[in-house]
């Protein structure tokens, strides 16, 4: 018999199954998947997102693999800000890309503040994200920056910079136009 929490999760999975055909994917945090059997019916519609350091699981390749083992058809949602928050060297992201090659279905792009809230992309983080973002070509990207309407265009430009190719030496050689008056 299911306890109340398990019953709620099962009911959520059932409700999401009803709309699965109408959507490209359903992103779930790893810690929301206590019983993979509830979610297995959704197959490749499930995208399991890596977590930031506040979460109990899904922060590392090993933790994410434990969840994905129970969901053989699920894809991975790589949140670059989350992995950067967990490991600023981005080595963990490279481990994730190696372990889950071919399963990455979506990339989330943003910057986190100290409280792990989504913030606008800044030029400094773009350089760091660019080292990894280029390894997931032809993947849907969700820009998670929380900005006002006037800042959307600049956030899109910064997001595009994350996916520009590196030069022959493997370094970044690009410039970002500064606003007039600076």
Positions of the model-derived regions?
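Short, catalytically relevant binding-site loops at active-site mouths
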Residues: 33-35, 52-55, 82-85
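Metal-centered catalytic cores of metalloenzymes
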Residues: 21-28
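Active-site core of PLP-dependent enzymes with the aminotransferase class I/II
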Residues: 57-59
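Histidine-acidic metal/acid-base catalytic patches
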Residues: 4-15, 21, 44-45, 61-80, ...
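Active-site-adjacent beta->alpha loops and helix N-cap segments on the catalytic face
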Residues: 30-42
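Structural motif
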Residues: 1, 28-33, 50-52, 144-147
């Amino acid at each position: 018999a299911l306890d109340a929490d398990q019953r709620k999760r099962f009911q959520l999975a059932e409700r999401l199954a009803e709309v699965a055909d109408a959507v490209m994917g359903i992103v779930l945090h790893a810690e929301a998947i206590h019983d993979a059997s509830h979610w297995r019916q959704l197959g490749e519609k499930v995208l399991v997102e890596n977590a930031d350091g506040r979460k109990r699981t899904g922060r590392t390749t090993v933790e994410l693999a434990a969840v994905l083992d129970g969901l053989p058809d699920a894809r991975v949602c790589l949140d670059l800000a989350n992995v950067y928050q967990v490991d600023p060297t981005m080595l963990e992201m490279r481990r994730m890309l190696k372990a889950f090659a071919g399963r990455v279905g979506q990339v989330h792009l943003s910057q986190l503040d100290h409280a792990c809230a989504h913030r606008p992309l800044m030029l400094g983080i773009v350089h760091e994200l660019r080292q990894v973002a280029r390894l997931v070509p032809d993947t849907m990207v969700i820009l998670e920056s929380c900005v006002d309407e006037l800042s959307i265009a600049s956030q899109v430009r910064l997001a595009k910079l994350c996916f520009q190719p590196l030069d022959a030496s493997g370094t970044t050689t690009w410039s970002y136009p500064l606003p007039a008056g600076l």
